Amino acid sequence: MALTLTDVKRIAHLARLEMADADAERTLTQLNEFFGLVEQMQAVDTTGIAPLAHPIEQILEVAQRLRDDVVTEHVNRDDNQRPAPAVQDGLYLVPKVIE
């Protein structure tokens, strides 16, 4: 898949982006290089290969990189709702906007 300069300008217009011609040409080159890489990866025969969530774990013993899920700060609902103009049962009351 290869994009044209017209495609890039159309996409920029749809995204409401102002793009100079030089920027559009540079973006076109970068996108086409990216799509070329994707085509190369799609050409690789992966028949019989199971998908891996973390492929590096297959070749290295890696410790879990994610931190423990622990509470680091406590939220005091009453303090947060004190400046609100209207609160009821721990919920913010707002004006009805859709009838």
From Swiss-Prot:
GO terms for molecular function: asparaginyl-tRNA synthase (glutamine-hydrolyzing) activity; ATP binding; glutaminyl-tRNA synthase (glutamine-hydrolyzing) activity. Keywords: ATP-binding, Ligase, Nucleotide-binding, Protein biosynthesis. Gene3D superfamilies: Glu-tRNAGln amidotransferase C subunit, N-terminal domain. One of its GO terms (biological process) is glutaminyl-tRNAGln biosynthesis via transamidation. It holds the Pfam family GatC. It catalyses: L-glutamyl-tRNA(Gln) + L-glutamine + ATP + H2O = L-glutaminyl-tRNA(Gln) + L-glutamate + ADP + phosphate + H(+); L-aspartyl-tRNA(Asn) + L-glutamine + ATP + H2O = L-asparaginyl-tRNA(Asn) + L-glutamate + ADP + phosphate + 2 H(+). SUPFAM superfamilies: Glu-tRNAGln amidotransferase C subunit. It comes from the Bacteria. InterPro entries: Asp/Glu-ADT_sf_sub_c (IPR036113), GatC (IPR003837). It is an enzyme of class 6 (ligase). Its EC number is 6.3.5.-. The keyword Ligase applies. Allows the formation of correctly charged Asn-tRNA(Asn) or Gln-tRNA(Gln) through the transamidation of misacylated Asp-tRNA(Asn) or Glu-tRNA(Gln) in organisms which lack either or both of asparaginyl-tRNA or glutaminyl-tRNA synthetases. The reaction takes place in the presence of glutamine and ATP through an activated phospho-Asp-tRNA(Asn) or phospho-Glu-tRNA(Gln). Heterotrimer of A, B and C subunits. NCBIfam families: gatC. Belongs to the GatC family. This is Aspartyl/glutamyl-tRNA(Asn/Gln) amidotransferase subunit C. The lineage of its organism: Bacteria, Pseudomonadati, Pseudomonadota, Betaproteobacteria, Burkholderiales. The gene is gatC.
